[in-house]
């Protein structure tokens, strides 16, 4: 990978694309591809790429964008006409993250560009490389491919460029133009929706006058009833067979109140059907029934409150706390009774037990239990007690060493509790005594050294004897 950076020329210019997939940093080769870089920077300054989509995605190959129409056929350069290709021997499609101009043929560069997603040797000397994606933003570039794609390599939910920011402009003479973006072509469905509604020509119909009158009446009624709910009474006000008097009298207090409030309206509307006496009788019946119902409801509510007093949550918690206290107290009493029974049993056993080893064992046990009860369980008191015991042991040890007797101590004293402190460790002297080499003993080993002069003489003498024997034979 290092040889790639050595081969590629240094960059001069930087642009930041803010996309829906994240920010993408692009460094430009403005010396190697000046026309393409000038075109790209000026379009960014003019906000030409803002809200444009990446209309083509080929996984593992390229991601293409820069077309304001979003179709893949639009977009133009700052020069007004397509500009020429700019190839360089040190710029090759040998890795991902390169930025190049998209074109439909030689010298046909406009506003569209693409990112490479891998090695693409087939694009060399066909498309102008003018920049590269740098840093960790290359991963945001790869996120542009994480979309569903149709058969025509178009993403269904495409990412888009939100805005562009020129971080370093190598061309000081660029003056942004004030241009309008070409609008996207609207689909056929939207065009159909925007078509104006046709006007009705009633003169063509044989019953045109009647139809026109009905149309006007319907429009007038719909305007008057706009925003209101409609019922059969609203639509059929003039029907004499419909009456506003309910067939079944309401038993609820709210309905009775509504009937009292609307009494004047009902009386004014139905004077034709109901006389004044009948109206008074009806009102009296309704008032009596209303009083009766309200008294019964109050009575029932009072009985319900007496019978069912709602128990609050706090009252329940108090009851539970009292119950737990009772249980804990009972458990403590039971434990105390058990301990008393056990103590009685122990005392009975001690009285019944004979003197001897068992009695001595029990005395020792009681002694250590008493010591254990005296010990503090936790805290500074336990620590102080431990240090006091340690100091006591040290003083006892130093005293025993100082008072060590010169004479040997018998084994009975050594086995005593404090006798081992003053005991001196002594070993039996088992060193071997020196023996005389000339004295033969059962433990004496024969040492033979061939370099010894005595042994040499013996060997020579034995050799002479052997020669003489051979000569005699």
UniProtKB/Swiss-Prot annotation:
GO cellular component terms, semicolon-separated: catalytic step 2 spliceosome; U2-type precatalytic spliceosome
Biased composition regions of type Acidic residues, renumbered to the chain: 256-266, 405-419
GO molecular function annotations of the record: peptidyl-prolyl cis-trans isomerase activity
GO process terms (BP): protein folding
Major location (coarse): nucleus
Alphabetical list of PROSITE patterns matching this protein: CSA_PPIASE_1, CSA_PPIASE_2
Keywords, ordered alphabetically: Acetylation, Coiled coil, Nucleus, Phosphoprotein
Phosphoserine modification, residue list: 347
Skewed-composition ranges (Basic and acidic residues): 178-193, 231-241, 267-348, 360-372, 426-438, 458-473
N-acetylserine modifications at: 2
A Pfam family assignment: Pro_isomerase
Top-level taxon of origin: Eukaryota
Occurrences of domain PPIase cyclophilin-type (ranges): 11-166
Described purpose of this protein according to its UniProt entry: As part of the spliceosome, plays a role in pre-mRNA splicing. Probable inactive PPIase with no peptidyl-prolyl cis-trans isomerase activity. As a component of the minor spliceosome, involved in the splicing of U12-type introns in pre-mRNAs.
Family: Belongs to the cyclophilin-type PPIase family.
Stated name of the protein: Spliceosome-associated protein CWC27 homolog
């Amino acid at each position: 990978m290092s040889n790639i950076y050595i081969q590629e020329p240094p960059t001069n210019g930087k642009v930041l694309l803010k996309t829906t997939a994240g920010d993408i940093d692009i460094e430009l080769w403005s010396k190697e591809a000046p026309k393409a870089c000038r075109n790209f920077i000026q379009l960014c300054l003019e906000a030409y790429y803002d809200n444009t989509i990446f209309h083509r995605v080929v996984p593992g190959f390229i991601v293409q964008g820069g077309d304001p129409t979003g179709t893949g056929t639009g977009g133009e350069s700052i020069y007004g006409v397509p500009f020429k290709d700019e190839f360089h021997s040190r710029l090759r499609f040998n890795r991902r993250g390169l930025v190049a101009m998209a074109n439909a043929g030689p010298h046909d560069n406009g506003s569209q560009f693409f990112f490479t997603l891998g090695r693409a040797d087939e694009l060399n000397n066909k498309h102008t490389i003018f920049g590269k994606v740098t840093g960790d933003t290359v991963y945001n570039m790869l996120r542009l491919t994480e979309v569903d794609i149709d058969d025509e390599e178009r993403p269904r939910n495409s990412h888009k460029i939100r805005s562009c920011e020129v971080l370093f402009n190598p061309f000081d003479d660029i003056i942004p133009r004030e241009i309008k973006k070409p609008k996207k072509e609207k689909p056929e469905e939207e065009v159909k929706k925007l078509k104006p509604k046709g006007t009705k020509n009633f003169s063509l119909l044989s019953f045109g006058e009647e139809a026109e009158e009905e149309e006007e009446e319907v429009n007038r009624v719909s305007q008057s009833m706009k925003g209101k709910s409609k019922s059969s009474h609203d639509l059929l006000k003039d029907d004499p067979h419909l009456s506003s008097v309910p067939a079944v009298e309401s038993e609820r207090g709210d309905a009775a109140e509504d009937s009292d409030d609307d009494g004047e309206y009902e009386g004014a509307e139905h004077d034709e059907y109901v006389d004044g006496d009948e109206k008074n009788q009806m009102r009296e019946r309704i008032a009596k029934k209303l009083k009766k119902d309200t008294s019964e409801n109050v009575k029932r509510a009072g009985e319900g409150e007496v019978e069912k007093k709602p128990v609050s949550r706090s009252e329940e918690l108090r009851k539970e706390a009292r119950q737990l206290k009772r249980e804990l107290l009972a458990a403590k009493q039971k434990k105390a009774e058990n301990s008393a029974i056990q103590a009685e049993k122990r005392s009975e056993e001690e009285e019944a037990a004979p003197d001897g080893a068992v009695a001595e064992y029990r005395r020792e046990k009681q002694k250590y239990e008493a010591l254990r009860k005296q010990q503090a369980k936790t805290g500074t008191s336990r620590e102080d007690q431990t240090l006091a015991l340690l100091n006591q042991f040290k003083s006892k040890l130093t005293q025993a060493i100082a008072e060590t007797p010169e004479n040997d101590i018998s084994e009975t004293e050594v086995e005593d509790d404090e006798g081992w402190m003053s005991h001196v460790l002594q070993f039996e002297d088992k060193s071997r005594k020196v023996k005389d080499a000339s004295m033969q003993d059962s433990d004496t080993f024969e040492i033979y050294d061939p370099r010894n002069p005595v042994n040499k003489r013996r060997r020579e003498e034995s050799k002479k004897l052997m020669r003489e024997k051979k000569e005699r034979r």
